[in-house]
Amino acid sequence: MYLTGFADEAAQDLSSQIKATKEIGWTRISARGVNGANLHELPDDEFDKVADQLDDSGITIPEFGSLIGNWGKKITSNFDITLAEINRAIPRMQRLGTGLIRIMSYAQEPWGNNQQEEERFRRLREIHARFADAGLQAVHENCMNWGGFSPDHTLRLVEEVPGLKLIFDTANPVFQLDRS
């Protein structure tokens, strides 16, 4: 067992993230953002510098916090955006030796509205499959998304998306039916 956390909550720039991580005696960062941008959104040359800096520091990245299907994206959004994020994330995770990627199940609609569950499951099965095909594990994060509605929604998600794992982030909102 090891401890890790999102170092972008300590600082925006990578040098300060590395420093904060080392100051508490950790050697791993759950990577999400550098200089205000998610790792899968950084330009290639900037990502290469990040990867080299991590290598030089001895800090490893066991988990990648992505924007894939997050609470800011509606289920009606263009799925090509998600596919492009996946296509950028996979080689970057492989470069960093990262095995886990946090995903979500898209923004919830106001309670009582059509949640387009079948489309959610279709997308999440595709997302999971693309990472699995690359030898990586997608993990669904509890947050303000369909899978975070309730424990029943979370269990249904796991039933509908075989192989999907869960991550429970204690800093995220408590499960509740309606956050609209």
Residue ranges and their predicted role:
Residues 1-98, 132, 165:
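N-terminal pre-domain/capping segments
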Residues 9-11, 33-35, 67-70, 105-109, ...:
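Active-site-proximal loop/turn and secondary-structure-junction residues that shape catalytic pockets
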Residues 12, 17, 53, 94, ...:
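Residue-identity detector for glutamine
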Residues 16-24, 58-59, 93, 120-127, ...:
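Short low-complexity stretches enriched in small and charged residues
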Residues 41-49, 77-88, 112-123, 145, ...:
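Alpha-helix N-cap and loop-to-helix initiation/capping positions
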Residues 64, 128-180:
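Acidic/histidine-rich catalytic cores of soluble enzymes
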Residues 93-114, 134-143:
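Active-site groove signature of glycoside hydrolases
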